[in-house]
Regions:
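Conserved beta-strand-loop-alpha-helix junction that forms the acyl-donor binding cleft
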Residues: 104, 135-145
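Conserved acetyl-CoA-binding loop-helix of GNAT-fold acetyltransferases
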Residues: 109-123, 145-150
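Helical scaffold of the NTase/Pol beta-like nucleotidyltransferase catalytic core
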Residues: 174-197, 227-230, 429
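Nucleotidyltransferase catalytic cores
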Residues: 300, 304-429
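Conserved NTP/Mg2+-binding pocket subregion across the NTase superfamily
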Residues: 229-339, 343, 352
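GNAT-family acyltransferases
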Residues: 1-105, 154-173
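Catalytic metal-binding acidic patch
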Residues: 196-236, 251-256
Length: 429
């Protein structure tokens, strides 16, 4: 069982701990070798002096200054020991908070860093109203990179070997909901040895609130019982009862079944969550797109990773499913409804073309941008508009001009589908 941590704003008398870790070469080794132009920095060790005569000014600047800045010690609750420090401060020009975390050397590699970083993010987003939190450091610091990614950050950009990582307010609350959902599912299935996966737009950094789903797959070693299935099938609604304003629980979709049934496609006790509802059924299968996403980009949320028992789809499988999408587009998208989801047909076509050309799967947004960059779309204005709406759907959900346009997309979708048809035919030839 992981030890619990908490954050503690130090009293003035407790600043000796900060002085101690700032002067510890093992703790500060990550900081050595730089040309930093400020008093008290030791380039050879990375240590920074923190003499007592500086404490009063430092304390006035950092403590009690929310929401501009926040500083705290990391506390191990089992014995009350301080094990490091965290801080955030506002960067008004960038519109985000910069952050820092230092874990005392002797407490590293014990699983504390991710937990401490999550506590800092919780404070920043839930107490300080942060819109985003940012950090940057050398990409070669692989342990630090993984700590940030595990806590929910995404790669923002890279320049001259410096990696910038960012987590937005939306990402934080979505990931918090994912953690709560994962915990709830794992408790219900505690005796079934579940492996819980996240795949799709959330792991491809393409989730957009108001449009996207949160795709999960739960594979168990032991068959799900009827009482468990009854509890799972209404779990989204039960969580919403306790958190009515949560914007994410209703977005969860996927299937829960035994690994053996998922592999064999045999009948099983299956819990299915979809856009239009939920049910207990007897089968659940992936198409080649979902399987490729799961195997190449999926994230294990809980349990043992069993993906080595799954097979990566071949090009022929991807071709078959692209063709199925194409046939649906010809059948169902001759005319379109007054909803921005009608833009999804254009994104589906773009992803199909990308997949046929590249032999793999990417996010719909990335595929559409790739198609535009390669001048493969005969109706670029339509696809550009689809991308604009996809990237910020909540801003356009009540836009009458956009909604009126969605009713007229049929001919443009079919013109774009002509390109997909040519791609399919060229591969046959």
């Amino acid at each position: 069982m992981k030890e619990s941590l908490s954050l503690h704003v130090p009293t003035y008398k407790e600043l000796g701990y900060r002085q101690k870790i700032m002067q510890d070469p093992d703790t500060m080794s990550y900081n050595k070798g730089y040309d930093l132009n400020f008093d008290g920095y030791d380039k050879s060790t990375g240590c920074i002096s923190f003499p007592k005569h500086e404490w009063a000014d430092w304390y006035t600047y950092f403590i009690g200054q929310e929401p501009r800045r926040f500083y705290a010690y990391i506390v191990r609750e089992s014995d009350g020991k301080f094990i490091g420090e965290v801080n955030v401060h506002m960067n008004a020009d960038a519109g985000w908070y910069e952050m820092g975390i230092v874990l005392e050397a002797k407490y590293r590699s014990k699983g504390y860093a991710v937990a401490a970083l999550r506590l800092l993010l919780q404070h920043a987003f839930e107490k300080m109203g942060a819109e985003a939190v940012h950090n940057e450091f050398e990409e070669e610091r692989s342990a630090a990179v993984q700590t940030h990614l595990s806590a929910g950050f995404t790669r923002h950009r890279k320049e001259n070997g410096i990696l910038e990582l960012l987590i937005t307010r939306e990402q934080y609350f979505r990931q918090k909901s994912i953690l709560i959902m994962t915990s709830a599912i794992s408790k219900i299935l505690a005796d079934n040895q579940p492996s819980i996966y996240l795949y799709g737009s959330s792991v491809l950094n393409d989730f957009r609130l108001g449009w996207s789903d949160i795709d999960i797959l739960v594979l168990t070693q032991k068959r799900i019982s009827q009482p468990q299935a009854q509890e799972l099938v209404i779990l989204r609604q039960k969580l919403l009862e306790n958190e009515a304003d949560n914007a994410y629980y209703r977005s969860f979709e996927g299937g829960m079944l035994t690994l053996s049934a998922f592999l064999s496609k045999e009948s099983d006790c299956v819990v299915y969550w979809g856009t239009s509802g939920q049910r207990i059924t007897n089968t659940y299968q992936f198409d080649s797109f979902c399987m490729t996403e799961l195997l190449q980009n999926g994230k294990l949320l809980y349990g043992l990773d069993v993906r080595s028992q799954l097979k990566l789809p071949k090009y022929a499988d991807l071709y078959r499913d692209v063709k199925k999408h194409y046939e649906s587009i010809r059948k169902y998208a001759q005319t379109t409804e007054r909803t921005f989801y009608s833009f999804g047909w254009l994104l589906d076509i773009a992803r199909g073309i990308y997949t046929l050309r590249n032999g793999t799967v990417t996010s719909k947004t990335s595929a559409a941008q790739w198609v535009l960059n390669n001048n493969l779309c005969p109706v670029p204005v339509a696809l550009e508009t689809a991308l604009k709406v996809r990237r910020n759907p909540l801003a356009y959900r009540n836009d009458s001009d956009i909604l009126n346009y969605t009713e007229t997309l049929g001919p443009e979708i079919q013109r774009f589908a002509d390109v997909l048809e040519e791609e399919l035919d060229s591969i046959i030839r």
